[in-house]
Amino acid sequence: MMYIVFIMSVLYVVGFIGFSSKPSPVYGGMSLVVSGGLGCGIIMGSGGSFLGLVVFLVYLGGMMVVFGYTIAMATEEYPETWGSNVVVLGAFLVGLLMEVFMIMWLFSGEHELVGFYFGGLEDLMVLGEEGFEYVREDYSGGASLYSYGFWFLAMAGWMLFVSIFIAIEVTRKRY
Amino acid sequence: MNPLALSLILTTLLAGTLITMMSSHWLTAWMGLEMNMLTMIPILMKTTNPRSTEAATKYFMTQAMASMMLMMALTINLMYSGQWSITKMTNPVASNMALMALMTKLGSAPFHFWVPEVTQGVELTPGMILLTWQKLAPLSLLYQMATYTNTNLIYLSGLLSILIGGWGGLNQTQLRKILAYSSISHMGWMLIILPFNPTLTLLNLTIYIMLTLSIFMILTNTFTTSMSSLTLMWNKTPAMTIMLMTTLLSLGGLPPLSGFMPKWLMIHELTKNNSIIMPLTMAIMALLNMYFYMRLIYYSSLTILPSTNNMKMTWRFTNTKHTMTLPTLITLSNMLLPLTPMISMLE
């Protein structure tokens, strides 16, 4: 199971490289969707099935849809893709090369592997450490946001509201 | 700006800093820093020219990058220690990365490049908020977590800040850039004393905020933003010209004014800890700051440049700007030195 999470993490970074090399937002949006799906897979593979589905629903199903529609309204006639411009292709290949080097370094020496332990029992006991716990952490985390973490929720809602205000204030007509 | 929107944005700016200063959990501290950053953007973009839009964009980019680094430091700390407390970041990777992120937020070298450009691109009032209020939240976090960081990094950054703040301000004629480099230099002084005696960091912050607020308010009242407008200030408000002189001397750290108090106590504390070369270098480099403040004083108060005769007899219109807190601030920023024994109040 940890192999699957590891491969998904690598592909997640490759997806990030895909839009960081700055093609047109049409292709960047596609890369974001791929990365978002893989990120959801990482969360689910590490035991948080509820929060992974929340990522799919809210991030991909809400925000990326709106992003996709706005790009479709503002797109140009010949959008720049990874193969059309040598700068974008070069940036993508450099990022890919860096990722390959990092994986080679990760498996090279005798140092401790940070964050990944191949050979654990993650398939059978999904909560990470040895002992079987009676409380699912992701469900109870989501629930405690509404009970103990009420002020976190209030602040998060307040900041979403203020962010809309700021976005409208910044994009008002400026003469 | 619409008064309702402005009040919402200023409330959230205050709330962000207060949340960071009151928190013991790293996530709420990070949340307060993000609130600060986001609500600073429309304040910086209050005027409608492309220059302030560019300044707001630069501010957003650097602060977002610093927030990202801080988040990575927090998660590394969580991975190695399993807890979110601010005062116990024992992993060196996490604490040094968080240190660098907070130094970027403060604008100390070598992460200082955004400060002069952002301060110059905006009006005087947003620049004032940028250089005074936005220092409170990152410094309150640094005050709590600095014991576990690599102190060599703090000394290096502080010394570099004093050098760059001194040398960078020498060639400037625009007052906002001069005040930005002065801010970088004062951040350097505040950082160096942090491992030795954090109370003096808070003292320096308090006195620096009072001084910077006084100077910005004097400049806002007389509509001066460059050195050439400074030369005409003697005719409009002679009293404020003299006050600008004394406040600038205080900012440079000249006794018997209150700006001398933090510098004196810091050099005292450093020499008590057997470090001689560093306070010597700091004191000498503070003279660079003093040189360009003296240049401002020379052109505003000590000389009257040649001008036509009718410019020497301008009609005095009534001042439409508020000067409500200015007399108090000027008095505090010039005459606080005899109250030095009261710093035990800050402990």
From Swiss-Prot, chain B:
Keywords: Electron transport, Membrane, Mitochondrion, Mitochondrion inner membrane, NAD, Respiratory chain, Translocase, Transmembrane, Transmembrane helix, Transport, Ubiquinone
PANTHER family in alphabetical order: NADH-UBIQUINONE OXIDOREDUCTASE CHAIN 2
Designated name of the protein: NADH-ubiquinone oxidoreductase chain 2
Membrane-protein topology: Multi-pass membrane protein
GO CC list: mitochondrial inner membrane; respiratory chain complex I
Pfam families from the UniProt entry: NADH_dehy_S2_C, Proton_antipo_M
Gene that encodes the chain: MT-ND2
InterPro entries: Complex_I_Subunit_2, NADH_DH_su2_C, NADH_UbQ_OxRdtase_chain2, ND/Mrp_TM
Record localization: Mitochondrion inner membrane
One of the GO BP terms on file: mitochondrial respiratory chain complex I assembly
Domain of life: Eukaryota
Biological function: Core subunit of the mitochondrial membrane respiratory chain NADH dehydrogenase (Complex I) which catalyzes electron transfer from NADH through the respiratory chain, using ubiquinone as an electron acceptor. Essential for the catalytic activity and assembly of complex I.
Subunit structure: Core subunit of respiratory chain NADH dehydrogenase (Complex I) which is composed of 45 different subunits. Interacts with TMEM242.
The protein's Enzyme Commission number: 7.1.1.2
Chief site of localization: mitochondrion
Entry's family note: Belongs to the complex I subunit 2 family.
Species of provenance: Loxodonta africana
